[in-house]
A protein has these predicted regions:
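Conserved polymerase palm-domain catalytic core
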Residues: 1-78, 82-100, 105, 109-118, ...
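Right-hand nucleic-acid polymerase module
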Residues: 39, 92-93, 110-193
Length: 193
């Protein structure tokens, strides 16, 4: 999906917050995230404030999925989401309803290359991992990106550009992530660097 519409976000915030000074502060925070090309969209998702704001923004969608579509198994992180169901035809029908709601209410568009209907046994790609009923593996692209970042951090440490503490924090972060998937071989590879 495209980035959040800042005007819509402020409108949603005003539904919950009556204090104009606080709204003014939030507008300044939101507008500070906008790109120079387009001041109407964008929140950097690594920012803690953004994580809260994207959840507020997407709450309308969560409620739509839960109460209007009556989806029983739905997961969302920021603007990535999955809907699980036993009925392929029903899922196909929901795509149009989801697309229309997102466009009408939140001015968001589904990315056409990121809509999949597949069996759970073939793996559900979500948040950098491919999830199976009994295990999960790191997506190949995620794995490559992770090792590139580790190599860059290691290079920076060897050249005195970062402290050993920073290197260790990165390694521990990746090792923690790998505990949640079949990453034993990758853990050994990282420990061998």
């Amino acid at each position: 999906m495209k980035l959040l519409g800042n005007k819509i976000l402020v409108k949603i915030l005003k539904e919950y917050i009556s204090n104009e000074n606080f709204i003014w502060l939030l507008k300044n925070v939101i507008n500070s995230f906008s790109s120079e090309k387009d001041t109407s969209v964008g929140l950097p998702l690594g920012n803690l404030t953004s994580q809260l704001l994207v959840n507020i923004y997407m709450n309308k969608f969560d409620q739509f999925v839960k109460h209007k579509l009556k989806v029983k198994c739905y997961m969302r992180y920021a603007d990535d989401f999955i809907i699980l169901a036993d009925d392929k035809k029903w899922l196909e029908e929901q795509i149009t309803l989801v697309r229309e709601f997102l466009h009408r209410e939140l001015k968001l568009e589904l990315h056409p290359d990121k809509i999949f209907i597949k069996t759970v046994s073939s793996g559900v790609d979500f948040l950098g991992m491919v999830n199976f009923p009994d295990h999960r593996i790191l997506r190949t692209k995620t794995k490559k990106r992770m090792f590139k970042k580790i190599d860059n951090k290691y290079h920076d440490w060897r050249n005195g550009l970062i402290a050993e503490k920073s290197l260790n924090q990165s390694w521990k972060s990746y090792l923690g992530m790998l505990k949640h998937c079949n990453g034993y071989g990758m853990v050994k590879k990282i420990e061998g660097i």
